[in-house]
Amino acid sequence: MDLENAQNRIIDFIRDETGRAGVKGVVVGISGGIDSALTATLAVKALGKDRVLGIHMPESSLTPAVDSEDAEALADWLGIEYRTIDISGIISAFMAAVPESESADRLTKGNLKARTRMSLLYFHANRLNRMVIGTGNKTEILLGYYTKYGDGGVDLEPIGGLYKTGVWELSSRLGIPESLITKKPSAGLWAGQTDEADLGISYVKVDEVLKMIEDGVEPEVILDKTGISADQLNSVTRRIERNEHKRKAPPVPELY
């Protein structure tokens, strides 16, 4: 991949889309991970630091302190306006108001947290006449590895054309701190959660697989070239198929 070309195209994309919408800037959720770090960095290059608001939304009992420290350090490095909003009280109030939430499984509860964060981002975007820019990468989008109307509820996905491995490469090129690049990716929706444990395969391998699937490579060849198991390949293809609805607008019946 031509990293310079990718960088320039993403910067132009942010400028063009925000200009077309006539907004004053963007709001981005900063988790302390590499995807949001790269997104915020590119937004600053596109619009300038004064038009980028970073919001960190930890859950006090769950979010590792290092994530909050890394999020704040990134905002300081970029020189952007930055706020921290603890979502614990909001989640607790929801749980108290909806008794059934106590017995909900951890995925349902995790999705609630992602949608709470989306609502906070849009509150500030609406208040300030800005757009919400997402931090999803191509790997996550193809797999449907995100919450519908949560972290998937955004106006723009600037790094949505970059595989996860491409996110690491472009981040390194831009001088984003190595500690963020090498940190284990996690959505932070429950204790001990990591992306690669959820997926059952490393990002390096899953990116190889996704590229081959897009190129129409036969399953037997994918298994031979990547060295992954048939179960891992089936898991990837099932995710793509099962989560197709996330990549489409809600269906509407044809009446005329």
From Swiss-Prot:
Residues that hold ATP according to the record: G29, I30, S31, G32, G33, I34, D35, S36, T135, K164, S186
Catalytic activity: deamido-NAD(+) + NH4(+) + ATP = AMP + diphosphate + NAD(+) + H(+)
GO biological process: NAD biosynthetic process
Alphabetically ordered keywords of this record: ATP-binding, Ligase, Magnesium, Metal-binding, NAD, Nucleotide-binding
EC number: 6.3.1.5
Residue numbers binding Mg(2+): D35, E140
GO cellular component assignments: cytoplasm
Entry-linked InterPro entries: NAD/GMP_synthase, NAD_synthase, NH(3)-dep_NAD(+)_synth, Rossmann-like_a/b/a_fold
GO terms, molecular function: ATP binding; glutaminase activity; metal ion binding; NAD+ synthase (glutamine-hydrolyzing) activity; NAD+ synthase activity
Pathway: Cofactor biosynthesis; NAD(+) biosynthesis; NAD(+) from deamido-NAD(+) (ammonia route): step 1/1
Sites where the protein binds deamido-NAD(+): R115, K148, D155, H245, K246
Enzyme class: ligase
Record's function text: Catalyzes the ATP-dependent amidation of deamido-NAD to form NAD. Uses ammonia as a nitrogen source.
Subunit structure: Homodimer.
Family: Belongs to the NAD synthetase family.
Designated name of the protein: NH(3)-dependent NAD(+) synthetase
Organism for this UniProt entry: Methanosarcina mazei (strain ATCC BAA-159 / DSM 3647 / Goe1 / Go1 / JCM 11833 / OCM 88) (Methanosarcina frisia)
Gene: nadE
